């Protein structure tokens, strides 16, 4: 297994003054669609071994079967049109065709095949497969849709250093690689991220509103002159209704007694990577029911008694089966004192096999 920290360029929150400065310097901005997918880093070394990794350098469970040698990568590396003979990393957004974000990200994080996902498996099963059968889930690559942001020489990735290629040139590098990827891996839908050039802040706002109306999450605004940096750095900015943060589940949030959601799990206490503890709620009724039933089953199995609020002077009796799970929350804004407005639970970030390890 390749021991590498991909640490891709990650956009920071929208900062109008910084964006205006980049606009004044370059004369325009590059605005790309912000896709609802799973950030993926595909590393290919000079021996034609590939590694399909998440943005935190963990193997993506549903794509683990793609790791290792593939003669098609060898042919691509030997193609005269390939500028990266010593290996490269593709940085992009991984999506599953024909399904929404939550379904797609769930499939990519899935470890075991069952009746809910076997139609997406690379093999055709005649009989229903159950999770207890322990059949590894292998996503058929025909279901994969990949939007590419960048391509980096592998030695730069391994060094941990920034890649000294400006955004405006990186787009051309991606366009040069696309025909090779489409030729050697035609079953995968490869595309460059949809991008636009805007020449003032009014035009940027109009584009943002247009893409939101089309159903997209928002935009990634990029400084054309900024090189590809490693990690969460200024030069790429998220333009979307909310910000997000990662954290670890510490507890359950129960609905208020006497109100409609009494007796239901309405969210989680989450310890953010910043060290702040928040109550992340605002989940669907379907998730409330799912989480509540899971907690109830775990508690009854352990104690034979379930009481989310306690009875009389007795404390509540519940077990949190989600304790320690990695997750992502969203929030409207951060106040000057560091607290978050309207934190909401978005999704689990761990894998099915290890929910406590962020993917």
UniProtKB/Swiss-Prot annotation:
Function: DNA ligase that seals nicks in double-stranded DNA during DNA replication, DNA recombination and DNA repair in an ATP-dependent reaction. Binds specifically to DNA nicks containing a 3'-OH and a 5'-phosphate group.
Species of origin: Escherichia phage T7
Protein residues bound to a divalent metal cation: 217
Catalytic residues of the enzyme: 34
An example Gene Ontology biological process: DNA recombination
Annotated PROSITE patterns: DNA_LIGASE_A1, DNA_LIGASE_A2, DNA_LIGASE_A3
Binding site for ATP: 32-35, 39, 55-57, 93, 232, 238
PANTHER family: DNA LIGASE, DNA LIGASE B
Lineage of the species this protein comes from: Viruses, Duplodnaviria, Heunggongvirae, Uroviricota, Caudoviricetes
Highest taxon of source: Viruses
Record keywords: ATP-binding, DNA damage, DNA recombination, DNA repair, DNA replication, DNA-binding, Ligase, Metal-binding, Nucleotide-binding
This protein's record includes keyword DNA damage: yes
Family statement: Belongs to the ATP-dependent DNA ligase family.
Protein name, UniProt field: DNA ligase
Reactions performed catalytically: ATP + (deoxyribonucleotide)n-3'-hydroxyl + 5'-phospho-(deoxyribonucleotide)m = (deoxyribonucleotide)n+m + AMP + diphosphate
Entry EC number(s): 6.5.1.1
Cofactor dependence: a divalent metal cation
Matches recorded under InterPro entries: DNA_ligase_ATP-dep_cent (IPR012310), DNA_ligase_ATP-dep_CS (IPR016059), DNA_ligase_ATP-dep_T7_C (IPR041559), DNA_ligase_T7 (IPR016306), NA-bd_OB-fold (IPR012340), NAD_dep_DNA_ligaseB (IPR050326)
